[in-house]
Amino acid sequence: MSFEVADTLDMSTPDAKRASYALLVAQVRAVLEGERDWIANLAQFSALVYQSVPHLNWAGFYLARGEELVVGPFQGKVACVRIPFARGVCGACARSREIQLVEDVHAFPGHIACDSASNSELVLPVLAGERLVAVFDLDSPLTARFDAEDARGFAEAIAVLAGGTDWPQ
């Protein structure tokens, strides 16, 4: 399959951001078309996001394994390998199964600094039905990089990914 990713998405205004997330969701559908393998889909999703969304220094998955998260496909610097559900922004997302939007990670109790350049973070749960299979973690060197529109846009993209993927039992 040949696929070209759009240039960096425009996040400069609320309207541009909404249009950019609609494009991202369409690109996710195109990239995943005909492929249901979970490793391939997580890898492609991470690459697509990292390549097209501005001001990120890490984008990827942590896989749910018991009461901890284990690093999965990602783009960015070498990452923390294991994160207990009891620690950090990713752990809070895994525990609550709710989106975690953190404007300043240094003010977050129990934050795990895998990359000291990260200043804000957005983490979304990835569910297969009711089962937590992973979290999708986005880090930025900018403080307050993410907002509610980012959370909404990524939640829609994650829903497309989750529904188009065959997850291991």
Predicted feature residues:
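A short, aliphatic-rich beta-strand micro-motif
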Residues: S120-L127
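Short hydrophobic/aromatic beta-strand element in the GNAT-like acyltransferase core
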Residues: W58, V123, V135
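Regulatory sensory and allosteric helical modules in signal-transduction proteins
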Residues: L56, A64-C114
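Intrinsically disordered, low-complexity terminal regulatory regions
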Residues: M1-P73, K77, E156-Q169
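Well-ordered alpha/beta subsegment
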Residues: F146-G153, W167
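Sensory-domain boundary capping and coupling elements
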Residues: L127-S140
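A generic structural motif
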Residues: L142-A144
